[in-house]
Amino acid sequence: MAIVFHKESRCFHLYNDEVSYIIRIMENEQLEQLYYGKKIHDREDFTYLHEECMRSQMSICVPEPGILSMQYTKQEFPTYGTGDYRSPALTIVQENGSRIVNFTYASHEIYNGKKDILPLPATYVENEDEAQTLEVTLHDAVMDTDLILSYTIYEEYPVLTRNAKICHKGSEKIVLDKIMSASVEFNDMDYEMVQLSGGWARERYVKNRKLEMGIQSIQSLNGTCSGAEQNPFLALKRPHTTENQGEVYGFSLVYSGNHLGQVEVSTFDMTRVMMGINPEDFSWELTQGESFQTPEVVMVYSDQGLNKMSQTYHRIYRKRLMHGTWRDQARPILLNNWEATYFDFDEEKILNIAKKAKEAGVELFVLDDGWFGARNDDYCGLGDWYVNLEKLPSGISGLSRKVEELGLKFGLWVELEMVNKDSDLYRAHPDWIISAPERFESHARHQFVLDFSKKEVVDYIYEMVAKVIRESSISYIKWDMNRYMTEPYSKGTEPSQQGKVMHKYILGVYDLYTRLTTEFPEILFESCASGGARFDPAMLYFAPQTWTSDDTDAAEREKIQYGTSFVYPIVSMGSHVSAVPNHQLHRTTPLSTRANVAYFGTFGYELDLNLLSAKEIEEVKAQVEFMKEHRDLIQVEGDFYRILSPFEGNDTAWMVVSRDKKQAVAGYYERLNKVNASWMRLRFKGLDEDQLYKVKWEDKCLKAYGNELMYAGIPVDRDYCNKTNGDFHSVLYTIEAED
């Protein structure tokens, strides 16, 4: 790992054992990107990679006879109005109305380690030898403003992180209309764009499209979250790249609010990728001495396919984004009462469910919505964070201790960012909701968005919920958020500051998370947003697991968890066994398949075990024991491999292999049964070719070498006409090395 500056050629080379990133200072003192990809040898002069020729209609930005044009240059941070007619990464409006800027090289610093960008979450280092950072300071003399571009390269990961910061020193105010976190350019357009798209109950479906000239993008304008529609991630892969071979570049934004990921192909087949805060309804005024910091983009390069890209994201996000008590721990097996009771419960019913959970070996009981205020339905009570003593006469403090006396840990659901109008909080502070003057106040789920851009609102909510936690014995918090923002306007905020509201809202969320996780470091936080609408890297910084989707149907979860695995580690995926018929789809799937899918996540239950048969209870007990035996491998110690995609056929398969390749667990899932089906073999991945393994599944056992299991494969059982399996059949394989 090194960051080298070659003074004569004015080139920067950032590299480790797997990746190189090269930029140079051009003759106009702006930055040009020369190369990003597989690691290449360092040399004194990389300027041979600069491409330049005279073209018709080009606007030249250097004195004659120079022919440098920004329109045909791969720029490091492109700006508006000086001959580049593609989308800029930065737009600044000055007091005279001009948007023309000229940020030129002023200085740079190379140092070991990595700085925080608080209050924004970001990846980190635990010692300075893990990474090196380059900070390049560019200066606009007319505005007297600095633009600082930061690059960090890690020793152990093919990862480059980037962010940008504006520091305004001039006497006249300026307004940021757009500032991306990173911009990267490629020589050609021979790529496919991979994105994770969807909606409620079908989050993060894998979508591919071939790049075309013009702009293709993903974005969120939801205000409160990164959204279920478009995850803040995209990748560019070569057309023939697969899970296991070929080039792919991943871009992941560590941010939970409005985002934009854009790929633009020029008429000369150059490809520009930009990612950052969505500029729509964003406007940030800076006066003298003020600054603005962008979120971080985590860029991953792989020349070994999509699965290597994913494993890199899994490792760095688990080890250098998540932090705190739970970073390196396997998760407790929980039971959540939501689908068992919804709002209809009392203390006796809750304790009966908890007792049965304890008998089955569950470790954590979670009380969901309905425990506070006058909360008996969606219409009222939200925002009143004090216990409903009619339902729970012992209070949360008493109930939590009764649950602990059963031998279980106790967890609690909250939705801190929202309010019902039928609540004491709203009646006391009607001006605390986000809404525009003299406009209809749109509602969703009968609730409204609290204005977290205001410190006094965050302060109030913090004190309310912290009081409940302090007085109780709580080991887990599920932090939900169930609606998007509408009519974005902050009452009492100056008109010139309204463009800051949505970003400041997200900063308010981060502030509350920081306060709670600081005061209660032992609590396991799980984020949630109508299921998986805020499954983004920034949330993992505060809450090391996220509710993956409200859709708990096993067959649907195959797609959701498969897509989620493109970026997010298995240990971050909230995954539960729920009742049948499923509450979202009314589909019935086998209890074994529901568990076989949920194992590849945090694992838990979302049902009333009292309603199961004695046979089913015994099956649940066996599932719990299996997960306890294998969760360190699945959640902490293993690498995840995708084998068969549910987006490409009727079958899904994946597996987790320990780093020493001594253990593995694999899941195979057949969606619909096939009559008189053809044979197929399941080929495992990630094993030691020369190691002898014992493979167990159902009542069968096989000893075979790793190369047999990976290349020849193992036949998937086919009974004649498949009469015995039925739809939604699954098989779980355990693989152990033989001495």
What does each model-found stretch correspond to?
Residues Q71-Y72, E76-I117, Q245-N258, V300-T325, ...:
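Glycine-rich, aromatic-flanked loop segments that form ligand/cofactor-binding clefts
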Residues S98-Y105, W284-D303, F728-I735:
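Short Pro-Gly-centered flexible turn/kink motifs
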Residues L234, P646-E689:
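Carbohydrate-binding surface patches
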Residues L672-D739:
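C-terminal beta-sandwich/jelly-roll accessory domains of carbohydrate-active enzymes
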